[in-house]
Amino acid sequence: MKPSVILYKALPDDLLQRLQEHFTVHQVANLSPQTVDQNAAIFAEAEGLLGSNENVDAALLEKMPRLRATSTISVGYDNFDVDALTARKILLMHTPTVLTETVADTLMALVLSTARRVVEVAERVKAGEWTASIGPDWYGTDVYHKTLGIVGMGRIGMALAQRAHFGFNMPILYNARRHHKEAEERFNARYCDLDTLLQESDFVCLILPLTDETYHLFGAEQFAKMKSSAIFINAGRGPVVDENALIAALQKGEIHAAGLDVFEQEPLSVDSPLLSMANVVAVPHIGSATHETRYGMAACAVDNLIDALQGKVEKNCVNPHVAD
């Protein structure tokens, strides 16, 4: 008899078929308490869980006594109670490598669109404001040769550094938990403390996961240390930034502009002051949102769940010691 798994995110037909070759698959719309209660027997028997964008906490795990592995279609896993999973010896799998290049593309797009005011001036053209040769009020700022500060030099940070160094000849500063020898050798990146990075960078790109240590890492103090001409980019996790402090910094002119793919609350409220600022490019968490990458992430998550329930945790496992 095949193990039972719960799928709470739609999959392409071929990936669903692959999953069904190994498991009895039960599909649900979400992991809300109502859904769990309505499908209590299914959740009680499930050994695997696969999906994204839902919270997996201790309360849910209490309803799933046979759960052995959960696989998320994402690299981030701050919506999972890792301690609760680990205490119950439940493996947590994620997709850390599939989306690297695509997210780096998004970061570079935010750098370019904020610096050159692409969204703002495109909207002005559509509104009929382009009636003569443009003047300084339409101008942006250069990207090439400007200093890029990267906070978080992981896979995505490295991919961004590659684009900035080879494509735009940008000097690169970085701050991370440790020195990154490859970044220093390949891109001539310079490690520095966060204060130095903030004071010297023309673009500050934040690429950090959400943890207890990174929550509100960026606040009023950090924005005050940045150049008034600096542009802030965040494509990591929204709550790493105190959004009210960011709004205040933009309103006071402490920083020049912001390109944001993530927010403290998602979806972003239609009442957010960020949406009324011409110098803010706000996109709806599209970091990995291409057809190719989202398919690759889903395929990786399917393979991860198959591997996990077969006891193979050599890669893509957040808590591999659970299998010991």
From Swiss-Prot:
Which EC numbers characterise this protein's activity in its record?
1.1.1.79, 1.1.1.81
* Predominant location category: cytoplasm
| InterPro entries attached to this UniProt entry | D-isomer_2-hydroxyacid_DH, D-isomer_2_OHA_DH_cat_dom, D-isomer_DH_CS, D-isomer_DH_NAD-bd, Glyo/OHPyrv_Rdtase_B, NAD(P)-bd_dom_sf
Care to name a GO molecular-function term for this sequence? hydroxypyruvate reductase (NADPH) activity
Compartment list = Cytoplasm
Pull one GO CC term from this UniProt entry.
Answer: cytosol
**Enzyme class, one word?**
oxidoreductase
The record lists the catalysed reaction(s) as:
glycolate + NADP(+) = glyoxylate + NADPH + H(+); (R)-glycerate + NAD(+) = 3-hydroxypyruvate + NADH + H(+); (R)-glycerate + NADP(+) = 3-hydroxypyruvate + NADPH + H(+)
Which is an annotated Pfam family here?
2-Hacid_dh
Which UniProt key words apply to this protein?
Cytoplasm, NAD, NADP, Oxidoreductase
Q: Which residues form the active site?
A: 237, 266, 285 (proton donor)
> Does the UniProt entry include the keyword Transmembrane helix?
no
The protein's job, in short, is: Catalyzes the NADPH-dependent reduction of glyoxylate and hydroxypyruvate into glycolate and glycerate, respectively.
- Family from the record: Belongs to the D-isomer specific 2-hydroxyacid dehydrogenase family. GhrB subfamily.
Note the subunit structure.
Homodimer.
> What is this protein identified as?
Glyoxylate/hydroxypyruvate reductase B
Q: Origin organism of this chain? A: Shigella dysenteriae serotype 1 (strain Sd197)
This protein's encoding gene: ghrB
